[in-house]
A protein has these predicted regions:
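Non-catalytic propeptide/linker segments at domain boundaries
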Residues: 121, 127-214, 218-221, 226-231
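Metallo-beta-lactamase
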Residues: 122-155, 180-181, 190, 285-339, ...
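Short internal beta-strands
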Residues: 279-289, 417-422
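Di-metal (Zn2+ and/or Mg2+/Mn2+) metal-binding site signature of metallo-dependent hydrolases
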Residues: 249-276
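Cytosolic regulatory regions built on CNB/CRP/Popeye-like sensor folds
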Residues: 433, 445-713
Length: 713
């Protein structure tokens, strides 16, 4: 932890000030409780909400009060004090209702298509009421609102000062706290692979084995690999950076299974949504609507807007859903909020995930006797699929979690197939010698199932690559058939030159796995290419010589298409039109600008390449107003040379120079007016993306809405 200007910065984010009332924490990104648990002063009992509760650039909630509340109330028997505005109180209550007690109104019949004798739809409201008891949000924590921009706790006064907080103690100024909170991921990686990871046909990679109160281990979450694609289950908040540091391309994961809305299971979901492409989330309608209400409250965005950022695939009780060839049969677990587990079948192998679940038969019997569940639900819970080949089962603190002693009482054959997660190492080891095994995180510890390739595997993999290329979506079936007939596969060793500058073009390349680098003298940095990215199209479509060297940065697996076949394939297609546009607008000066500008720092090279294809040069030689306050933003502007003045209604002036942006994709998408007037006092050169093109780009990459541009535009 670093100390500055009267406060301490927590490693993951947020600030702590020592006062006469004890430590006060400002902001709470996910898992900051792990930072404070090991300190002398412990977890602060007073927490101040940040000025903005959601950090869109990181895709995370930075006002995660769930675990501080759980810790103080359920472990210490205290009611923490949370401070913020009255509007934040309202929003926090909405979010915590979903996270702590679950939705107020729901009907699991919405999660079933076929309500018949062979499809049992439980009524879990009694179970949720059993776990809730007499608790209310008011019984869990205290809330103190700011009045006229200030609040007092004992001798401590906290005042809102613009975007920041001023803290005085006993009349003495002690700290100025930034009101906007960032997040820094902290996690163990394990042994990173020397070469990029190649996803297996069927496997499981544990991202973390433990729970949200364990400062020593990663929080639980895992990836299921099916037909060489990844399905992330309950992504931890750091999952994407974990993958990158482990030498795993995050683009292999195109789907999420969301089991419930506790912070240690849903906190990383929006991080994944804000990556390249459009992610598909699989869950029930009940859980999805709860998730949207929770994050609408934290982010301040409407539920309708959040829905536009990803694809939702509803799953149903009693109707298995197929994801990458695996059949998922879902069921509702026994927990305090709606929570689903699933049994997965793939090529004769089975894997079951309990999710958070109270699996103790004695507790279930008590709930039956007290009328919290009916006999049919009790019988369903008693018939957990212990016969599965691999059992991923949680264990934790009662009453919400399965006690380890119950799992240790299972027959040895069942124990030997059971992997226990959601538990700290010290707690697992305390049970003594058993046949159980604790989940082992790390890409090097991926569990591989023995399977055989299907007769269609090569075609499936080729089509999977095809669908990942954004512009192939509009191809008719006959073109897809043609694609399968014209492709070849090629391997390149690390360091091997694939394309030489000045040579004639003979192939179009698509990367299946591994990395390549584009090397050209006038680029400020070589372009990095990874899985599902392509190259070599310029020389084929223009007849010109190759314009750069491309070298295999790792061992590389590619799909290639010979020149004549490629030209015939793209002729007259939307794909060909888009490729030609990319070629026409590609410019090394534009690329260098996008690489050098902080405005595009969080974009991948592939996203920069796509953005580059939409940008048009625009120049004004005389002073002029570019966008007036109140006008609809016609598109996105990037200053490439010159200066643009920004004036607000109060007469304040600032300037935008090279790499600066006018507009914000989020506001452009919603056709909202500009908040400031932008004008040039002399010659200025810019790059411009019209609103129609911006909407097309956003549809393919929804996460870009919060990553490009000035939020204040």
């Amino acid at each position: 932890m670093s100390e500055k200007r009267g406060y301490v910065e927590l490693p993951r984010g947020g600030c702590v000030v020592q006062t006469s009332q004890g430590p006060i924490q400002f902001g709470a990104p996910p898992e900051t409780i792990k930072d404070s648990l090991g300190t002398e002063t412990g977890v602060p009992e007073i927490l101040v909400l940040p000025r903005e509760m959601f950090n869109w650039s990181k895709g995370i909630n930075v006002a995660d009060m769930e675990f501080p509340i759980y810790y103080h109330f359920f472990i210490r028997g205290k009611r923490p004090l949370i401070c913020g505005t009255m509007e934040q109180a309202r929003l926090l209550a909405v979010a915590l209702q979903e996270a702590v007690f679950g939705p107020k109104n729901f009907d699991l019949r919405d999660d079933s298509i076929d309500i018949s004798d062979d499809v049992f739809v439980p009524d879990i409201r009694g179970e949720m009421a059993f776990f809730r008891g007499e608790l209310t949000l008011k019984s869990l924590f205290r809330y103190r609102p700011f009045k006229d921009g200030r609040l007092v706790v004992g001798d401590v006064e906290i005042a809102i000062d613009g975007d920041d907080y001023e803290v005085r103690d006993g009349g003495r100024h002690v700290a100025t706290i930034p009101g906007r909170i960032t997040y820094t991921a902290r996690f163990d990686v394990g042994d990173a692979l020397p070469e990029p990871f190649k996803p297996p046909r069927f496997g499981v990679t544990c991202l973390g084995p433990s729970h949200g109160f364990d400062p020593k281990d990663n929080t639980s979450g895992f990836i299921i690999w099916l037909n060489h694609n990844g399905v992330m289950v309950d992504p931890p908040v750091n999952s994407t950076e974990w993958l990158l540091r482990s030498n795993v391309n995050p683009k292999f994961i195109d789907s999420i299974v969301l089991t419930h809305c506790h912070a240690d299971h849903d906190a990383g979901t929006f991080q994944k949504i804000l990556e390249e492409g459009r992610v598909t989330i699989y869950t029930t309608k009940t859980i999805m609507e709860s998730f949207l209400r929770k994050y609408s409250a934290f982010s301040g965005e409407s539920v309708d807007y959040l829905r536009r950022l990803f694809s939702f695939q509803q799953v149903f009780i009693g109707r298995p859903v197929t994801i990458h060839g695996g059949e998922f049969d879902i069921f509702y677990a026994l927990h305090s909020i709606p929570t689903m587990g699933f049994r997965l079948s793939f090529q004769g192998k089975t894997f079951v995930y309990s999710s958070d679940h109270q699996g103790d038969p004695q507790v279930q019997r008590t709930m039956l006797d007290q009328g919290a569940m009916n006999r049919e639900r009790y019988e369903q819970l008693q018939h957990f699929p212990w016969e599965s080949d691999v059992i991923y089962h949680e264990s934790g603190i009662a009453p919400l979690h399965t006690p380890l002693k119950f799992l240790a009482s299972l027959p040895e054959d069942v124990q030997s197939r059971t992997v226990v997660y959601h538990i700290a190492s010290k707690d697992f080891n305390a049970i003594g010698e058993t046949a159980l095994q604790r989940a082992t995180f790390g890409i090097e510890n991926t569990l591989y199932f023995e399977t055989e390739p299907s007769v269609y595997e090569d075609a499936y993999r080729a089509l999977d690559i095809l669908k990942r290329l954004d512009f192939f979506e509009s191809l008719p079936v006959k073109k897809v058939q043609e694609f399968l007939s014209i492709i070849e596969r090629r391997h390149f060793a690390r360091g091997e030159k694939i394309i030489e500058e000045g040579s004639k073009g003979d192939y179009f390349y698509i990367i299946e796995s591994g990395n390549a680098i584009v090397m050209k003298e006038n680029l400020v940095r070589g372009k990095q290419l990874g899985a599902f990215e392509y190259f070599g199209e310029v020389a084929l479509l223009t007849g010109s010589d190759r314009t750069a060297d491309i070298v295999a940065d790792t061992d590389l697996e590619t799909i290639v298409i010979p020149r004549d076949r490629f030209l015939n394939f793209v002729s007259g297609t939307e794909f060909g039109r888009i490729l030609q546009r990319v070629i026409d607008r590609r410019d090394n000066r534009t690329w260098n600008l996008l690489v050098e500008s902080d405005s595009f720092a969080r974009l991948s090279d592939y996203q920069r390449m796509w953005l580059e294809s939409y940008l048009e040069p625009l120049a004004y030689s005389e002073p002029r107003t570019i966008v007036a306050e109140g006008d609809r933003l016609p598109g996105l502007y990037i200053v490439s040379d010159g200066r643009v003045e920004v004036r607000d209604g109060d007469g304040g002036v600032r300037s935008i120079e090279r790499g600066g942006v006018i507009g914000y994709l989020h506001r452009i998408m919603r056709d909202e007016p500009a908040r400031y007037t932008y004008s040039s006092s002399g010659p200025v050169e810019m790059l411009f993306m019209p609103r129609s093109d911006a909407l097309e780009l956003i549809d393919r990459n929804p996460g870009l809405t919060m990553r490009i541009g000035d939020p204040s535009a």
